[in-house]
Amino acid sequence: MIKELQGGNMATKFKTDEEMRGDRLTQCLDDIMRASTEMMVQQQLKTIQLNSDVAAGFRKALSKSLGDRVRAFHSILDGVETTLTTASQYLDAVEEAAVKMKQWKQQQEEEQRRKHQAELEKNKRQQEHDAATKAAAAQQLMAQQSPVDLTAPTPTGLASNLDKSNRVGGVKPFSAEFGHLDEMDLSMFGGIDGHGDFSLEDFNMGGNSVPLNGGRPRNMVMADAGGFPARGGMGRGGATAINNGAQEIKTSTNEASTNNRNNDGTGGASNPRISSNYNSAVADHESIGLRVDANGQNTKQSGQQSGAGLNPDDYLTLNDFNDLGIDWNTGENNELDLNDFNI
């Protein structure tokens, strides 16, 4: 065993300086092991006393050298710990810097992506706006070039239904709203006999307005027993055109009763309705007060002047008709039956 230790000690001595200077920690450990080995050898030699020249125990110098080696080893360990701590702190700082750098890069990428997205949205909105502007301009141009539709619905009142068009259904004539006013009996108007404030002369009826028959003046004969002619009457023309549809009223004295012919071509001589109302027609004419002189001119009774004694309050207006409470839409074919009214 001693030989092995001595052989190891000898082998240690043969180490080169370059190998010894390779690592301080390794060198320190080798020194500690060598000093410890020498001390153990000295103690064994003292114990077994193989040689009387061997000093008892290990020497002080050897003990001091071993202590120095141990302190150096501890110093190296402290340095290693400090180095490791510094390295750990450095690694933490590097890691933190790397994390911050990564976060900064992510923020930069996010900002770049956000800017790119905003730019894309801006371009998209601009394109949509341009497209809408072009479409509006094209629509306006088409509207200006297209013809105007004059058949659009036109409401006629505030309460009209806008969904309905005025093109649906025909427009009623004026006579349909108020009945056939041209078929009314002239006897319904008071003061028309020429003595009152309302006479036929005020309508400027000439000599041709009242035909003659054998020199005897006649009024426009009413065809209906109730006072309504079959066609014609008072109406458009201010009560002067009694014969509706006739182009002119004949004034021949040799002609039979041809006044107020109907559209079917029947004359007064063969029309029982006209014949039956002849006397009443003459009486109406005489009551009106028209006279025919030798020259065929209509005159009024003596003492009466045209338009004399007229009272504006006696004129009939639409309000007077409305006061009668007449339903103008009753009857067949918009014909009004005045027999129900005591006029």
Curated annotation (Swiss-Prot):
One of its GO terms (cellular component) is nucleus. Its main location: nucleus. Component of the Mediator complex. The keyword ATP-binding does not apply. Keywords: Activator, Nucleus, Transcription, Transcription regulation. It is found in: Nucleus. InterPro entries: Mediator_Med2_fun. This is Mediator of RNA polymerase II transcription subunit 2. Component of the Mediator complex, a coactivator involved in the regulated transcription of nearly all RNA polymerase II-dependent genes. Mediator functions as a bridge to convey information from gene-specific regulatory proteins to the basal RNA polymerase II transcription machinery. Mediator is recruited to promoters by direct interactions with regulatory proteins and serves as a scaffold for the assembly of a functional preinitiation complex with RNA polymerase II and the general transcription factors. It holds the Pfam family Med2. It comes from Eremothecium gossypii (strain ATCC 10895 / CBS 109.51 / FGSC 9923 / NRRL Y-1056) (Yeast). The keyword Transcription applies. Residues 105-141, 252-277 are annotated as: Disordered. Coiled coil: none annotated.
